[in-house]
């Protein structure tokens, strides 16, 4: 059921591509022992994905709707001028160049989400068109996905050499036919600004009919522009400009505002760091760390006091040195202050090799450069 439903909704162009791919890989799948049901499920899944992408939404619905409206409007004229139209059928090569005109169809803004292209013949050439010509013209149409906010302009080329332009606008819900003008429409779209350089596509459409009344297809030129963020300023620098014709007039779209391009040398572009936090810490962070360490020490002291543990005094403290010993040291006679080279000990005997010192012996001071002495203790 899903396959039959998708067959009616998916256009013939896309369905033919899907069928060709399935037929090409059918033998390979069968050689590998894969059931043919898998191919059918793959085809169904492919068509479902195509419909979910909305790439072909309204492809046939708009076509049928426009055909019915044009036929209803010109049905009385066909009955009154049957003889005149029969004469046109006898000489189609003379009438087609004169009647081939590019027309525009305005579609309401509620349908601006997608931009499919529709094949619609001229109102005076309805009787010359058949189902096969419409199908072949639909096979040559392409879908151009435009960014959000851009009014899609669609160009359709029929078998008779007519270029039909379908425009979606927000000024009404009626389909309005307008003749084509030889102008160049330039429309610039700047997406939401993000850090770093982004590309803003500029869609330029050239509408210029060729001599003889036959109009070519629309040329769509993508002009990328580089947007640089420098502090609080935004610079738009155009990179390349492509011209489809040697001489053409460029008319900016209504309401378009282009920021003034400033030289990049005035201010260095701001480089954003995206690989983590900064390399240096602020003074506030350091103060917070110190306060956190102090709080931890206070908590430890409180916990020790609550547990009733008495802190032991560390080793190598100066508690064993009293002031009285210092007084006794200076009151002692026979004091030597010097440097030493060697000190030898044999059991309780010590031998000193002294140098560059002063000694006080029996109340007298002596200065020496070298001295040797023995002692026991």
Swiss-Prot record:
SUPFAM superfamilies: Transcription factor IIA (TFIIA), alpha-helical domain, Transcription factor IIA (TFIIA), beta-barrel domain
Primary localization class, coarse: nucleus
Record's compositionally biased regions (Low complexity): 69-79, 89-105, 248-280
CDD domains recorded: TFIIA_alpha_beta_like
Example of a GO cellular component annotation carried by this entry: cytoplasm
Signal peptide residues on this chain, from the entry's feature table: none
Compositional bias (Acidic residues): 281-330
InterPro entries attached to this UniProt entry: TFIIA_asu/bsu, TFIIA_b-brl
Disulfide bonds, paired cysteine numbers: none
Subcellular location: Nucleus
PTMs per UniProt: The alpha and beta subunits are postranslationally produced from the precursor formby TASP1. The cleavage promotes proteasomal degradation.
Alphabetical keyword list: Acetylation, Nucleus, Phosphoprotein, Transcription, Transcription regulation
Gene Ontology biological process terms in this record: positive regulation of transcription by RNA polymerase II; positive regulation of transcription initiation by RNA polymerase II; transcription by RNA polymerase II; transcription initiation at RNA polymerase II promoter
Sites bearing Phosphoserine, chain numbering: 281-282, 317, 322
Record keyword Transcription regulation present: yes
Residues carrying N-acetylalanine: 2
Region named Disordered: 69-107, 248-330
Site label Cleavage, positions: 275-276
GO molecular function list: DNA binding; protein heterodimerization activity; RNA polymerase II core promoter sequence-specific DNA binding; RNA polymerase II general transcription initiation factor activity; RNA polymerase II general transcription initiation factor binding; RNA polymerase II-specific DNA-binding transcription factor binding; TBP-class protein binding
Subunit field text: TFIIA is a heterodimer of the large unprocessed subunit 1 and a small subunit gamma. It was originally believed to be a heterotrimer of an alpha (p35), a beta (p19) and a gamma subunit (p12). TFIIA forms a complex with TBP.
Role description: TFIIA is a component of the transcription machinery of RNA polymerase II and plays an important role in transcriptional activation. TFIIA in a complex with TBP mediates transcriptional activity.
Name the record gives this protein: Transcription initiation factor IIA subunit 1
Upper lineage: Eukaryota, Metazoa, Chordata, Craniata, Vertebrata
């Amino acid at each position: 059921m899903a396959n039959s439903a998708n067959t009616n909704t998916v256009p013939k162009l896309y369905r033919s591509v899907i069928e060709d791919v399935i037929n090409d890989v059918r033998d390979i799948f069968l050689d590998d022992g894969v059931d043919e049901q898998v191919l059918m499920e793959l085809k169904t899944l492919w068509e479902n994905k195509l419909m979910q992408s909305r790439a072909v939404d309204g492809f046939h619905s708009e076509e049928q709707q426009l055909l019915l409206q044009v036929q209803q409007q010109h049905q009385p004229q066909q009955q009154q001028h049957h003889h005149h139209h029969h004469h046109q059928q006898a000489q189609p090569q003379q009438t087609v160049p004169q009647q081939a005109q590019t027309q525009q169809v305005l579609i309401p803004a509620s349908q601006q989400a997608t931009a499919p292209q529709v094949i619609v013949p001229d109102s005076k050439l309805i009787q010359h068109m058949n189902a096969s010509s419409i199908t072949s013209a639909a096979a040559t149409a392409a879908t151009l996905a435009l960014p959000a906010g851009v009014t899609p302009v669609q160009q359709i080329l029929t078998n008779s050499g007519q270029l039909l332009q379908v425009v979606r606008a927000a000024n009404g819900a009626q389909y309005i036919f307008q003749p084509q003008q030889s102008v160049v429409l330039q429309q610039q779209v700047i997406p939401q600004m993000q850090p770093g350089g982004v590309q803003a596509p500029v869609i330029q459409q050239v509408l210029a009919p060729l001599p003889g009344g036959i109009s070519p297809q629309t040329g769509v030129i993508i002009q990328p522009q580089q947007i640089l963020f420098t502090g609080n300023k935004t610079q738009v620098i155009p990179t390349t400009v492509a011209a489809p014709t040697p001489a053409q007039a460029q008319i900016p779209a209504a309401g378009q505002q282009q920021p003034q391009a400033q030289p990049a040398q005035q201010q260095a572009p701001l480089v954003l760091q995206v690989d983590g936090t900064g390399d240096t810490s602020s003074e506030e962070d350091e103060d917070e760390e110190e306060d956190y360490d102090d709080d931890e020490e206070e908590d430890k002291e409180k916990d020790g006091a609550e547990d009733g543990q008495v802190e032991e005094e560390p080793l190598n403290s100066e508690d064993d040195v009293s002031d009285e010993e210092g007084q006794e040291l200076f009151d002692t006679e026979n004091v030597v202050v010097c440097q030493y080279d060697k000190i030898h000990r044999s059991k309780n005997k010590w031998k000193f090799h002294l140098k560059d010192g002063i000694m006080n012996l029996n109340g007298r001071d002596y200065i020496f450069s070298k001295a040797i002495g023995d002692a026991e203790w």
